[in-house]
Amino acid sequence: MSQTLDGEGKLVSMIMEGIQYARFAAICDDQGNILWNSQRNEVDNILTLEETKASLKRSIDTWRERENLSEKIGKGRYAIVGYDKIKRITIPLHNGHMLFVSVEGEKPEYIGDIMKIVEYAESHR
């Protein structure tokens, strides 16, 4: 079954084309089901598909916990978690979906690109 590229699919494609340090990008629903994803061809998987899904689900659960504090500290815009090998960026989308981007570990150049994605996601709410 082929899918037509909707706005979220285009966003994933834009990330992979526009951020040279991006390893993986995905959009999930609020249950952690992967709706769109792309992985750079020359990149080896660090996690298995099941480990990736479990990690995405934990991230979604963490965002739900953050929402409990939003009245006091404001709505969360994005989160960056640094690991030795990668950085994982999560950005909530307007429809309850979540954008995940995994980038190479020590590449500070990507931060400006990530902020452009955050601004893009916020402007399409």
Where are these regions (language model features)?
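Non-catalytic interaction/Regulatory regions outside core domains
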Residues: M1-R125
